[in-house]
């Protein structure tokens, strides 16, 4: 029976650590600043934005939210991003995705200063990750949170076989590269993988981010593996992951629940990136 990795508890520990760092910055002159921009009135997006605002306030980060109507044009949004790029009180900028169809997401992401891109989506930041450049870069929050979970549970990455199910630019690809940086042997699986079970049964670390409820069954998990379930799917009014939790837990050494596993870590890493951005700006 695998140990359940408590993402809520670990995220809370990280927030408490960040509070101390934020306190020092505040005493030195100003707290880290985070600006979130929401276009439209998508209920899920509004919920995420409120959660981010609440956590920022709890930690002591200066938080600014722009609620824009769905009719906001791309040029108007780009103008707001430009102003935020030049606002010295703002260290991190996050434009909540998805955006309305008439706005080009790539253009907006590229307009954010890479030094304020706390979501880690700017091509310069992803390019630094994919080319193995360290130093001043931001990693996407969910992949960063996955690595943090593994580290804080004392799960060895170096030399282990890691399998990532899913190849999105938001989770699959960046987490694969972060695992590679830590010297794991990494396989990325996707919708064209011939036999998913053959691949997953080899994994010491199994990260599942496919967006398909209970895609990974219990028999597809290696005995003693660490299973990180990134999926959030609503089925019959309940949130379920991409892994059949109860069946997989019988074989796994560690497993994240849904909800309460990876989710809380994503917001914690956003705050960590904002504090990191404040360090970069240094004023």
Swiss-Prot record:
Binding of NADP(+) occurs at 166-168, 191, 232
Q: Which InterPro entries does the record cross-reference, listed alphabetically?
A: Aminoacid_DH-like_N_sf, NAD(P)-bd_dom_sf, THF_DH/CycHdrlase, THF_DH/CycHdrlase_cat_dom, THF_DH/CycHdrlase_CS, THF_DH/CycHdrlase_NAD-bd_dom
Extract the Pfam families matched here: THF_DHG_CYH, THF_DHG_CYH_C
Q: Can you state which reaction this protein catalyses?
A: (6R)-5,10-methylene-5,6,7,8-tetrahydrofolate + NADP(+) = (6R)-5,10-methenyltetrahydrofolate + NADPH; (6R)-5,10-methenyltetrahydrofolate + H2O = (6R)-10-formyltetrahydrofolate + H(+)
Q: Select a single GO molecular function from the record's annotations and give it.
A: methenyltetrahydrofolate cyclohydrolase activity
User: What superkingdom heads the lineage?
Assistant: Bacteria
Q: What is its EC number?
A: 1.5.1.5, 3.5.4.9
Q: Does the keyword Membrane apply?
A: no
Q: Name one GO biological process term.
A: L-histidine biosynthetic process
GO cellular component terms, semicolon-separated: cytosol
- UniProt cross-references to CDD domains, sorted A to Z: NAD_bind_m-THF_DH_Cyclohyd
Q: Which UniProt keywords apply?
A: Amino-acid biosynthesis, Histidine biosynthesis, Hydrolase, Methionine biosynthesis, Multifunctional enzyme, NADP, One-carbon metabolism, Oxidoreductase, Purine biosynthesis
Question: What is the recorded function of this protein according to its Swiss-Prot or TrEMBL entry?
Answer: Catalyzes the oxidation of 5,10-methylenetetrahydrofolate to 5,10-methenyltetrahydrofolate and then the hydrolysis of 5,10-methenyltetrahydrofolate to 10-formyltetrahydrofolate.
Q: Could you tell me which NCBIfam families the record lists for this protein?
A: PRK10792.1 (NF008058), PRK14186.1 (NF010783)
* Assembly: Homodimer.
Family recorded in the similarity comment: Belongs to the tetrahydrofolate dehydrogenase/cyclohydrolase family.
Q: What is the name of the protein in this document? A: Bifunctional protein FolD
User: What is the organism field in this record?
Assistant: Halothermothrix orenii (strain H 168 / OCM 544 / DSM 9562)
């Amino acid at each position: 029976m695998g140990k359940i990795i408590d993402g809520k508890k670990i995220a809370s520990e990280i927030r408490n650590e960040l509070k101390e760092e934020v306190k020092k910055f505040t005493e030195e002159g100003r707290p880290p600043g985070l600006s979130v921009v929401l276009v439209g009135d998508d209920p899920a997006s509004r919920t995420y934005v409120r959660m981010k605002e609440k956590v920022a306030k709890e930690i002591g980060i200066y938080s600014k939210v722009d609620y824009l109507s769905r009719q906001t044009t791309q040029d108007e949004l780009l103008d707001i991003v430009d102003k935020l790029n030049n606002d010295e009180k703002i260290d991190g900028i996050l434009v909540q995705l998805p955006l309305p169809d008439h706005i080009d997401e790539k253009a907006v992401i590229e307009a954010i200063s890479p030094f304020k891109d706390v979501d880690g989506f700017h091509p310069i930041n992803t390019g630094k990750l994919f080319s193995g450049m360290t130093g001043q870069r931001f990693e996407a929050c969910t992949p960063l949170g996955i690595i943090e979970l593994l580290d804080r549970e004392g799960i060895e990455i170096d030399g282990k076989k890691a399998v990532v199910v899913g190849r999105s630019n938001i989770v699959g690809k960046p987490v694969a590269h972060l695992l590679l940086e830590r010297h794991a042997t990494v396989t990325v699986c996707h919708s064209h993988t011939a036999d998913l079970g053959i691949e997953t049964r080899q994994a010491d670390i199994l990260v599942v981010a496919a967006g398909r409820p209970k895609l990974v069954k219990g028999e597809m998990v290696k005995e003693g593996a660490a299973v990180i379930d990134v999926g959030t799917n609503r089925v019959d009014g309940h949130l379920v992951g991409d892994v059949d939790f109860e069946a997989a837990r019988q074989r796994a050494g560690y497993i994240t629940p849904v909800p309460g596993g990876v989710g809380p870590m994503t917001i914690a890493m956003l705050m960590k990136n904002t504090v990191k951005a404040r360090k970069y700006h240094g004023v």
